[in-house]
Amino acid sequence: MSHFAMELMQLLSVVKLTHLPYKGAAPAGIAVMSGEAHVSFLVMPVAQAQIRVNRLRGLGVAAKTRAPVIPQVPTMEEAGVKGHIALQWNGFFAPAATPRAIIDKLHRETVAALSNTDVKQRLADEGADPVGSSPAEFAAFFRSEAAKWGDVAKRSGTKLD
């Protein structure tokens, strides 16, 4: 997602950068801290830990609202990049032929787990904002995200290799 977040920023702003692909947030974060790279979009657990100890400077959070774990960092929109939302999310998937009763049970158990106070706190400490949407809502969200990032890939000329 970090690669696409950078491409989206370039599409929405006058900023143009040379893309340096890293294999994960940890190597990308190290590259920025060492001066090998100038900027990177990082996942919240990596970024917030380094921002807190002043090894990285947070320039913008790619979300609609500021992150509670690093409230001093503005959103990308507040930083001047209008419409820059690039959420890192995880989905829970099952094979298409899974019986509805099993899907419903998995959904109930997932929502229950995400409602647990300890689970919510641990996720919040990592900068996560858990959402227990319905299977239909998640399917709509997934389709929307696929369309959005497919468009970013096309407009930016991104190629898989």
Give the location of each predicted region.
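Conserved, function-defining micro-sites of small-solute handling proteins
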Residues: M1-D161
